[in-house]
Curated annotation (Swiss-Prot):
Its EC number is 2.7.1.26, 2.7.7.2. This is Bifunctional riboflavin kinase/FMN adenylyltransferase. Pfam families: FAD_syn, Flavokinase. InterPro entries: Cyt_trans-like, FAD_synthase, Riboflavin_kinase, Riboflavin_kinase_bac, Riboflavin_kinase_bac/euk, Riboflavin_kinase_dom_sf, Rossmann-like_a/b/a_fold. Gene3D superfamilies: HUPs, Riboflavin kinase-like. Keywords: ATP-binding, FAD, Flavoprotein, FMN, Kinase, Multifunctional enzyme, Nucleotide-binding, Nucleotidyltransferase, Transferase. It comes from the Bacteria. The lineage of its organism: Bacteria, Pseudomonadati, Pseudomonadota, Gammaproteobacteria, Pasteurellales. Coiled coil: none annotated.
Length: 308
């Protein structure tokens, strides 16, 4: 798969494509269905299959710190898009210039001149251009003028529930990990690099692997039973805390994982943390000793979950 950063670079690579556009946050079951269909159409038309992503995501640009939490960072999206057999991912910078671009300019400059689109699969509720004035009807009209095919990719449902990134965020916020997994088509996971921390956990008998988070707004908070996959492919059970660590007056979001029966040095490694079961919410304890007692209980709860 080829990754292209910046629309200006796409013009040198693409001479026609079957394209879809979106955030693809979570690359959930609905996204996966769209991608399978687009793969089929690209093969039928003998075109490369392309996905256009925006960075930052539009709502992050407009809403700033009030934007919804991401389900996954860009690097992880690209990983799952490659698994879906996408040929080309174009990452376009979403900034003021792009946000103020007129809808007809987006069609002619971005879709036609830069991406040379021949087939476009897009939601019929897709809005684009300054003040969201562009819509599916405008794309249909433009397709006749510029000679490309456009079709709508409808919403997909699971047990009458629309599959969407918003629905998955709500499931995670409600501690319904099973529903989130059903909508995602995979367990909810976070990927990150193990970094050095203040090593307070080892002073109370619970050393932790601290996972760097590239965002301070996350869709989950609290203490969880987790599975951690290392670079080697080994999988270890553990207990994790996602939060600001109020007992030590922490200010930044951090993912801390205590692995059971583990003694390896994994500093600097990329690891995959799969969230299996919510144990409790994050609490500020009166003392470090009280925290230690609770962690002992959390470990027993997690071990009981994995043994059940």
């Amino acid at each position: 798969m080829q990754l292209i950063r910046g629309l200006h670079n796409a013009n040198r690579v693409l001479q026609g494509c079957a394209l879809t556009i979106g955030n693809f946050d979570g690359v959930h079951l609905g996204h996966q269905t769209v991608l399978r269909h687009l793969r089929q159409k690209a093969d039928e038309l003998n075109l490369p299959m392309a996905v256009l992503l925006f960075e930052s995501q539009p709502r992050e640009y407009f809403m700033g710190k009030n934007a919804p939490a991401r389900l996954m960072r860009l690097r992880d999206k690209i990983y799952y898009l490659e698994k879906a057999k996408v040929d080309v991912v174009i990452v376009a910078k979403f900034d003021r210039t792009f946000a103020e671009q007129l809808a007809d300019v987006f069609i002619e400059q971005t879709l036609v001149n830069h991406l040379h689109v021949k087939f476009l699969s897009i939601g019929d509720d897709f809005k684009f251009g300054s003040k969201r004035q562009g819509n599916f009807a405008m794309l249909q009209a433009a397709s006749k003028r510029f000679g490309f095919i456009v079709e709508d990719n409808r919403s997909f449902c699971l047990d009458a529930q629309r599959i969407s990134s918003t629905a998955i965020r709500e499931a995670l916020a409600n501690d319904d990990l099973q529903l989130a997994e059903n909508l995602l088509g995979k367990p909810y996971r976070i990927f990150g690099r193990v970094i050095h921390g203040n090593k307070l956990g080892r002073t109370i008998g619970f050393p932790t692997a601290n996972i760097r988070l590239h965002r301070q707004v996350n869709p989950i908070k609290g203490v969880y039973a987790v599975k951690v996959r290392l670079k080697s492919g080994e999988i270890f059970n553990g207990v994790a805390n996602m939060g600001k660590r109020p007992t030590i007056n922490g200010l930044m979001q951090l993912l801390e994982v205590h692995l059971f029966d583990f003694s390896q040095n994994i500093y600097g490694q990329m690891v995959e943390v799969e969230f299996c079961h919510k144990i409790r919410n994050e609490i500020k304890f009166p003392s470090f000793d009280d925290l230690k007692v609770q962690i002992e209980k959390d470990v027993e709860t997690a071990k009981a979950f994995f043994n059940s």
